Amino acid sequence: MSIQVKNIEKHFGAFHALKNISLDFPEGQLVALLGPSGCGKTTLLRIIAGLESADEGKILLEGADATNIHVRERQVGFVFQHYALFRHMSVFDNIAFGLRVRPRSTRPSEAEIKKRVTRLLDLVQLGFLADRYPSQLSGGQRQRIALARALAVEPRVLLLDEPFGALDAKVRKELRRWLRTLHDELHITSIFVTHDQEEALEVADQIIVMNKGNVEQIGSPREVYEKPATPFVFDFLGQANRFDGQYHENKVELGEDQIILPNVSEVPHGKVIAFARPDELHIHAQPQDNTIQATFLREVWIAGKVVAELQDRNGRLIEIALSPDEARLHLFRPNQTVWISVSQLHLFADHVA
C-alpha cells in the first residue's frame, strides 16, 4: 500500500512539531524516519497510524483520504519500542489476540487462527516458544513476538517506533539484519522511526532525515551519506569533523591555517561550514604543504579500529581514523606537533553567519 502525507502541520501548544510536511512512501519499501529526539518523526508516525490527529493536512492510503478514518479501520500494524505484550498471556495467545477480538463477522475460526499464528511463529523463528510467557523471553524474542502480533491482522502497512531502542547493541544488530530479511520476504510497506544512523543506513530502502519539524533530505542510504544536502545531514549521519572558515579563490581559511582546494563552483565565496569524515584526514609527523597544524592528544582503540584525537591551533577537536597498522607504524606521542592533510573537504555556505 502506498502512503502520501500532504501538508501536515502539528502543534503541541506553542511548540511547532511538524511544519508543512509532504511525503510519498512507495508501496513495498522499508522507509526510515531518521532524526534526533524532538524532530517530529514519532509524531508523524502516530499521525499516519491514526493515533494522533494533525492540525492541518491529509493522509492518503492507496490514494484514498484516510485523514479522519479511525485507527482500527486503517489496517495498520504498529510496533512500539517497549514490547507491550500481555504478561498474563502465552506467546501464542499474544499473537492471536488481534484476531480473536475482531467482530464475529470478520473473526477467523480457531483453526484458521491456529494456522496463522503457527505460520507467524515460524516466520519469526520462535515456534518453540509458543507456550511460554513474556517474562520467560529475552528482549529480542519479545520484540519478535510483538512484530508477529502486529502482522497477525494482515496490516496493509507496518509502522515501527524505535523497535530496537530498548535492546543492547549486539541484539539490535542481529534484529536489524533479521528485519531486513523479513521485509524482503513479505514486501509490506513499512515505516520505522529511529535516531540510530547506523540502523537506518543498514536497514532502509529510503531514508527521510528530519530536524526541528522539517524534512532535511530524502534519498537512499548511499545518497544521504555520500551527498548530504545540508550541514545538519552531514553532521548527523556518521562521524564528521566540522570547521568554520572563509572560502575565496579555491582557498579555505580555517583560522591560522588554510587549505587549497580544486575549484568548488557551487559554493559562493564568503563564510562556509566545512566537513571532513575521519577517514578523509591523514596525519603526518613532518611539515607538509597544504596541511593543518595540530597537536596529537591520544589514540582510542575500539573493536579493531583506531581513532586519533588531535587539537588544531584554533582549539578544535579533530578525529582521524587510522588502521591498526598505521597506528603501530607512526607511534605518535601525546602533545606531539603533527600536520593534517585533507583528501576531501565538503563545503556548505554558512547562511546563518
From Swiss-Prot:
Superkingdom in the source lineage: Bacteria
Q: Does the keyword Magnesium apply?
A: no
Its main localization is: membrane
- Write out the annotated subcellular location: Cell inner membrane
Q: Where does the chain bind ATP? A: G35, P36, S37, G38, C39, G40, K41, T42
GO terms under cellular component: ATP-binding cassette (ABC) transporter complex
Domain ABC transporter, residue spans: 3-237
One Pfam family this sequence matches:
TOBE_3
Q: Record's InterPro entries?
A: AAA+_ATPase (IPR003593), ABC_SmlMolc_Importer (IPR050093), ABC_transporter-like_ATP-bd (IPR003439), ABC_transporter-like_CS (IPR017871), Mo/tungstate-bd_C_term_dom (IPR008995), P-loop_NTPase (IPR027417), Sulph_transpt1 (IPR005666), TOBE-like (IPR024765)
What does the record say about its membrane topology? Peripheral membrane protein
Per UniProt, which keywords does this protein have? Answer: ATP-binding, Cell inner membrane, Cell membrane, Membrane, Nucleotide-binding, Sulfate transport, Translocase, Transport
As its record notes, the protein acts as a catalyst of:
sulfate(out) + ATP + H2O = sulfate(in) + ADP + phosphate + H(+); thiosulfate(out) + ATP + H2O = thiosulfate(in) + ADP + phosphate + H(+)
GO terms assigned for molecular function: ABC-type sulfate transporter activity; ABC-type thiosulfate transporter activity; ATP binding; ATP hydrolysis activity
Indicate the quaternary assembly. Answer: The complex is composed of two ATP-binding proteins (CysA), two transmembrane proteins (CysT and CysW) and a solute-binding protein (CysP).
Q: Which NCBIfam families match?
A: 3a0106s01 (TIGR00968)
Describe the task this protein carries out. Answer: Part of the ABC transporter complex CysAWTP involved in sulfate/thiosulfate import. Responsible for energy coupling to the transport system.
Q: Spell out the family assignment given in the record's similarity comment.
A: Belongs to the ABC transporter superfamily. Sulfate/tungstate importer (TC 3.A.1.6) family.
What's the protein name?
A: Sulfate/thiosulfate import ATP-binding protein CysA
The species this protein belongs to is: Acinetobacter baylyi (strain ATCC 33305 / BD413 / ADP1)
